[in-house]
Amino acid sequence: MGLNPVQVSQMKLAFCLFNYFPFGGLQRDFMRIAHECLRRGHSIDVYTMKWDGPRDPLLPVTLIQPNGWQNHTRRDSFVSQLQPYLAQQPYDLVVGFNKMPGLDVYYAADTCFQAKARAQHGAWYRLLPRYRHLVACEKAVFAASMKTEILLISKNQQHDFMHYYQTPAQRFHLLPPGISKDRIAPVDADIMRVALRQKFQIEKNEFLLLLIGSGF
């Protein structure tokens, strides 16, 4: 089902992603979009393999236990087990935050795997099961014969997807910047900057380098 801007009545949505944890960029975008949909009166069922973190009572989560040990086999298992759940419910839209078959809408948080693989690896890499799995997932979303509508967060992504999969341009929808207001510099940012420099004895002509690593 394609995107139709005039459809403003309450919808029943399925949100699908492989894993949720509160510190991932994709996952944070997922949660912001989910809360906005709830605010507008839509209902959402979430399907995932794993959920780490608190749950919203208005956001029911179905955990699907995949088979297999490797990531690509587990994802294949998740997609296969997901289909009966989607068939049992009259969903208006199936929205994916990872590349997988059967999506009406895909939120493109990841870059083009095909472009990255060909730039970083030789031809031998394309023989691996992992490569074949990830390309098949991309084709299921971006192939010219598919109907999935694509929400982009970067215009630069579109060229690669169109190059490798001949995706029609009209299926791409560029989203505005989604920076949270609490991440924007406040009106007293200059005062805070001066106070921080005084606290750590940093002169006006000196730079402070802050190195951050995440290992959640």
Predicted feature descriptions by range:
Residues 18-20, 177, 211-216:
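Conserved donor-binding loops in enzymes that form glycosidic bonds
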Residues 3, 17-23, 36-73, 85, ...:
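N-terminal strand-loop element at the rim of the active site
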Residues 185-202, 208:
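A short helix/loop element that forms part of the nucleotide-sugar donor recognition site in Leloir-type
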Residues 151, 203-216:
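Conserved donor-binding/catalytic core segment of Leloir-type glycosyltransferases
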Residues 68-94, 131-140, 210:
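An amphipathic, basic-hydrophobic alpha-helix
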Residues 130-153, 158-159:
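Membrane-proximal helix-turn-helix segments that form the acceptor-binding/catalytic region
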